[in-house]
Amino acid sequence: MLNHEPRPKGVSPYMILLHYTGMETMEAAKERLSDPESKVSAHYLIDEDGSVFDIVPEDRRAWHAGVSYWDHEADINSVSIGVEIVNPGHEFGYRPFPDVQMGAVLKLCQGLQERFDITHVLGHSDVAPERKQDPGELFNWKWLAQNGVGLWPETIEEDHERAVVVARNDFEAEKLFVKLGYNPMTAYIDVVTAFHRHYYPAIFETGRQGEICEETIARLLSLIRQQKQLSSDMRD
């Protein structure tokens, strides 16, 4: 009995999905991810000391995303590589991710980008905002993006000008979140909170996570523009 299965015929991963383990120890997480009875698995596990463990072969469909959605795709497990990053998570004492661990995440993701046509690098909370928080607001997404893995908002004046109008119109704002990839059926506040965890973590210091503001919309517009350019580059 295995806790993974073949990918659908002809399907190659185009997404990297990052998680935290949310368990008290690395050993407990590794045991759970390797246990067929758990019905949970990931392709890789990265310890806090930077050690990387291969759990599931990349050509197999691991079971890490659960009920999830991104950009019209509801079978995230089939199109993704799942990476579990050791951290106790919000339940057991959430803490920053050590530099050596982040370095291992970067190296692994860079390798995946060389082997596959990766168009999305996301967190579990992005694809399942209503039930997941990982890898969370302490994860250094900005640093990853600066080193070529994933996207990070780089706003221009036009973004801020448009944000002044859109931030006052929830209907228009919701359409933009859906355009980026979020599930239109997910509660709006959950989507905004997930966006903040990934792309505007500083807002958690103010206690205003989940609230729409002009800066949130400006960042959202920047990401939509970058994603459009990335998709165009991948086609060329």
Predicted regions and their residues:
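Active-site-adjacent loop/helix surface patches within enzyme catalytic domains
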Residues: 1-119
